[in-house]
Amino acid sequence: MDARELAKYIDHTNLKAFATREDIKRLCEEAKEYGFYAVCVNPYRVKDAAEFLKGTDIKIASVVGFPLGATFTETKVQEAIMAVRNGADEIDMVMNIGAMKDGDYGFVERDIREVVEAVHPMGAKVKVIIETCYLSDEEKIKACELAKKAGADFVKTSTGFGTAGAKVEDVKLMRSVVGNDMGVKAAGGIHNAKQAIAMIEAGATRIGASRSVEIIETLELI
């Protein structure tokens, strides 16, 4: 795999609370320079990213219910709609983790489905962050099944704000559950090309990283 091929797996990410307009401009310039698939930014910064990426084919992802997933479904829906209206192509929503731990699977599925049904007609894709660090393997399996049943396009390992990030074994498990019908995004703690390629070999079709430039620049060290 060469640098351009690897870059096309990557959502170049800045979800810091203190990210400035200048930080987002830099993120977008790096995305253009390295050929990353997308940038991932907080909803407030989607308009900025859309401005900086105008005329390119680089996608814009934004987050919903981030990073806890514990807000109202209606809030997630409106947040997603507004992000797409402002230029987002993809929505990375956080599953309601507490409801998942409660075993309230009907609610978890509805929470996802309502976001999916709101933005799919607008042409946007939905990734569901299941936050693997808080789940047992059985819960990870169930979460993936619910995301698939709800019509989501991807399952995603982590917010990057939890107690741990992506693990190869979790990516393998998630891929085994969703099959080839959905994407799997590995995110959190991926800092170099070796880690990124391990995730891809495990079944990830997208990598979320804030240190994407390091990932590309360490490719030659493998």
Swiss-Prot record:
GO molecular function, one term: deoxyribose-phosphate aldolase activity
pH dependence: Optimum pH is 7.0. Extremely stable over a wide range of pH levels.
E.C. no: 4.1.2.4
Regulation: Shows high stability to high concentrations of acetaldehyde.
Pathway recorded for this protein: Carbohydrate degradation; 2-deoxy-D-ribose 1-phosphate degradation; D-glyceraldehyde 3-phosphate and acetaldehyde from 2-deoxy-alpha-D-ribose 1-phosphate: step 2/2
Compartments it resides in: Cytoplasm
Domain of life: Archaea
CDD domains to which the protein is assigned, alphabetical: DeoC (cd00959)
Enzymatic reactions: 2-deoxy-D-ribose 5-phosphate = D-glyceraldehyde 3-phosphate + acetaldehyde
Keywords assigned by UniProt, alphabetized: Cytoplasm, Lyase, Schiff base
Active-site positions on this chain: D92, K156, K185
Temperature profile: Optimum temperature is 80 degrees Celsius.
Gene Ontology CC annotations of this record: cytoplasm
Pfam family, one: DeoC
UniProt keyword Nuclease present: no
One GO-annotated biological process of the protein: 2-deoxyribose 1-phosphate catabolic process
Enzyme class: lyase
Similarity remark: Belongs to the DeoC/FbaB aldolase family. DeoC type 1 subfamily.
NCBIfam families: deoC
Function: Catalyzes a reversible aldol reaction between acetaldehyde and D-glyceraldehyde 3-phosphate to generate 2-deoxy-D-ribose 5-phosphate.
Subunit structure, as described in the record: Homodimer.
PANTHER family listed in its UniProt record: DEOXYRIBOSE-PHOSPHATE ALDOLASE (PTHR10889:SF1)
Protein name per Swiss-Prot or TrEMBL: Deoxyribose-phosphate aldolase
Organism annotation: Aciduliprofundum boonei (strain DSM 19572 / T469)
